[in-house]
Amino acid sequence: MGYGHYEPLRHYAEVHLRLSPAPRGSGISFDSECPTDILAQNWQNLVRTHVFEKKHKGVLTGSELCDVKVTLLTGRSHLKHTEGGDFREATYRAIRQGLGTIAASGQNDTAGALLRFSISLESEQAGRLMADLQRMECSFGSPQMEEERMILEGRGPAAVLSGYGREFISYTRGKGVMSFWFDGYEPCKHQQEIVEQIGYQRERDLENPSCSVFCSHGAGFPVPWDEVQNYIHCK
């Protein structure tokens, strides 16, 4: 569950979302289980728009959120104070709050980008190349020989392949050729190492807040993501 509330003075919106894992490569999808007599259709349409209008960041590494189904469960507007931008704030915060809750429960997966590659080099350097690819946990097919050169095709993690070029150029003396194509995402095998290496601090990402804003005595005040459930208005 993700809860987002946005209520500085003379503004109001609250959104409750369910975040569910989706099939790999399916991207972000949206559905609503909220009756229109609870939250009017025009506000629900805005929530949907705000789900799709930006690339939402995950809370572990700040990487783009992918392969998630977002379901609107309930929400609330205010007849006098709600403006269109209020549901943008509430929706963004609900997604981040939900991701924080999932991460705290240990159920969050970090997806790493994959690259498909084609590498051509002199056959005498083939052993070094294949040993390096195995070390980087890449998969590849059988080598193809063209005169005195070998061509190898496969796929592997972008995080390691993208930094391999300098080493490759060095031991092939500039005679090797590498070509890469993006090939989707898959769960990282070494998630904790990657999280520590990137060092993303979500509390400092002011453009993607996880907290909500409530109002008391005519003034808005922030509530940390892990306390929002104690303050929400929709039950």
Q: How would you name each of these model-derived features?
A:
Residues 1-235:
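Accessory interaction regions appended to the cores of large information-processing enzymes
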